[in-house]
Design a protein with these regions (language model features):
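Helical "lid/coupling" subdomains associated with nucleotide-phosphate turnover
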Residues: 2, 16-19, 35, 39-68, ...
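A generic, well-ordered mixed alpha/beta core segment in the N-terminal half of proteins
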Residues: 117, 125-140
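Beta-strand initiation motifs
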Residues: 22-27, 146-151
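Short amphipathic
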Residues: 29-32
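Short beta-strand-to-turn element immediately C-terminal to the catalytic PLP-Schiff-base lysine
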Residues: 17-19, 139-142
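N-terminal basic/disordered segments at the start of proteins
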Residues: 2-24
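Short acidic/polar active-site loop segments enriched in Thr and Asp
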Residues: 10, 71, 289
């Protein structure tokens, strides 16, 4: 059994799983919206309260992993930690729990997510978009004979939290000018990335697959899914027309009304519009009329890679996680993980 913790810009997640033959066999997942990246785009700093929220959540995850009988644990951080000058403060707090926190580059995040997604698509050529809070990772390629082929991989600084903080008011209905600016920002970054020779010269993707809370929320909202059912959402598609309709609905509602929509987590309401704009622009630019959502995301890729390293096999991506024996992890909050003010 292996445990992996992914600390994202919006959400902190834990997966505890058995992995064999490069596939995740059994898994339990936990998720908590902590909004680590709030304000980072403007200040370049992690908010102290956000750091504490993440710390308390991770402490509970370490305890849960121990109770599940896990032998080793991996802890990674993504966009918000990459951007923040005070990310070491969070790193020290996590280290006090006995973890080895690793800030992974965007390109590695993209490759790990692709690895997680690809197990459901055989050898097909797919474009995977991991649209998170601070960034969107794009990876185009396939898996053939257990070898990952990725001719195109990019990490773009555009995500639901970044777009919201930069262009959209969290408490009010956005103006048409703000919406247009958000669309233009996302569109330009996507167009620049997809205009590169690596993408243009690669075999065209058969399918567009999206991971992350925005993608899964769009599927759930479109079906008015209550309660959330990952089995229903996984590998289900949504049309570009339905994404546009959901964006138009969200843009007309204040945050407190968005939070009441069936299929949407209340804590995700402040950033869902920004995330929807990002994915709509991606569909527009790539020309895909349908986007498939996947629950097999970065966590799956982390699990597969961690299992390979634990078993002494080569990592399937050009990166090795640091597996911390779980008996070295403390579990439960340390008495003084933060400096006194």
């Amino acid at each position: 059994m292996i445990a992996v913790i992914d600390i994202g810009t919006v959400t902190v997640r834990l997966a505890v799983a058995e992995v064999a033959g490069g596939r995740v066999l059994r898994m339990a997942k936990y998720s908590e919206i902590c909004n680590l990246g709030v304000g980072v785009d403007a200040t370049g700093l992690l908010d102290t309260d956000a750091i504490k929220r993440v710390y308390m959540t991770v402490a509970s995850y370490v305890e849960a992993a121990k109770e599940a009988g896990t032998q080793a644990i991996v802890c990674t951080l993504t966009s918000a930690a990459r951007d923040a000058k005070n990310a070491p403060d969070l790193g020290m707090a996590l280290a006090s729990l006995g973890l080895e926190p690793m800030i992974i580059p965007g390109e590695i995040e993209a490759a790990l997510t692709f690895l997680g997604v690809a197990q459901d698509f055989g050898g097909r050529q797919i474009l995977v978009a991991d649209s998170g809070g601070g960034s969107t990772e794009l990876a185009l390629g396939n898996v053939t004979n257990n070898i990952i082929n990725l001719p195109f991989i990019r990490s773009l600084d555009v995500g639901c939290r970044r777009v919201t903080d930069r262009f959209l008011s969290e408490g009010d209905i956005p103006t048409s000018a703000h919406l247009e600016a958000a669309h233009a920002f996302a569109s330009q970054l996507m167009r620049d990335a997809l205009a590169t020779s690596e993408y243009q010269e690669a075999i065209r993707p058969e399918v567009l697959v999206a991971t992350g809370g925005t993608a899964t929320s769009l599927i759930a909202m479109n079906a008015q899914l209550e309660p959330y059912d990952p089995a229903f959402v996984h590998l289900r598609g949504i049309s570009v027309e339905d994404v546009q309709k959901l964006e138009e609905l969200l843009a007309k509602l204040p945050v407190e009304e968005r939070a009441k929509l069936p299929g949407l987590q209340e804590k995700r309401a402040p950033v869902i519009l920004g995330g929807t704009i990002v994915l709509f622009e991606l569909m527009q630019i790539t020309g895909f009329t349908t986007m498939i959502a996947s629950e097999s995301d970065l966590l799956f890729g982390l699990l597969i890679t961690s299992a390979a390293v634990q078993e002494g096999r080569p990592s399937p991506v050009v990166w090795k996680p640091i597996l911390k024996p779980l008996d070295k992890a403390l579990g439960g909050p340390s008495k003084k993980p933060f400096k006194e003010k």
